[in-house]
């Protein structure tokens, strides 16, 4: 996938972590992006994303009704130019009846929701800005033992 020419959600995280120079090298074609096709953590997250969305729909308080499920679209891409910088992000789910987004993650079993929120906050805030959303639900599978979801406000 060509990720040059715009800033994305993962890029926002890298910028906030201080990896902006390497990101700039990649975005300008001076360096190659890492190939994540053999990264098991990344691929497991991709593979379990649909299950994570299904679990969120079934178990999130106030969300399991068919009415709400019908108001959710998976994999929506938002684009905007912010301060003359092209930005693009694809959210895992968009709850269009409430203008809220869903981001799904799969992490190790001893991780905490607080740590996940901290780790992904730049990506979440970036997506909320692009989607003009008021909230983002972070739905996280921890290993194979537990699941949690939490709402993050703009």
Labelled PLM ranges:
Residues 1-54, 59:
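Charged, glycine-rich intrinsically disordered N-terminal tails and low-complexity linkers that flank
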Residues 58-154:
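Nucleic-acid nuclease catalytic cores
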């Amino acid at each position: 996938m060509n990720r040059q020419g715009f800033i994305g959600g993962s890029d926002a995280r890298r910028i906030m972590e201080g990896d902006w120079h390497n990101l700039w090298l990649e975005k300008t074609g001076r360096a190659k992006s890492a190939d994540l096709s053999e990264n098991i953590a990344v691929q497991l997250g991709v593979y379990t994303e649909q299950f994570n969305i299904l679990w969120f729909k079934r178990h999130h308080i106030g969300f399991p009704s068919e009415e709400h499920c019908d108001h959710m679209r998976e994999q929506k891409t938002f684009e905007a130019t912010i301060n003359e910088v092209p930005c693009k992000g694809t959210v895992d789910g968009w709850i269009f009846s409430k203008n809220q987004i869903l981001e799904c993650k799969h992490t190790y079993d001893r991780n905490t929701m607080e740590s996940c929120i901290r780790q992904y906050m730049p990506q979440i805030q970036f997506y909320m800005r692009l989607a003009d959303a008021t909230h983002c639900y972070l739905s996280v599978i921890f290993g194979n033992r537990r699941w949690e979801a939490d709402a993050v406000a703009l």
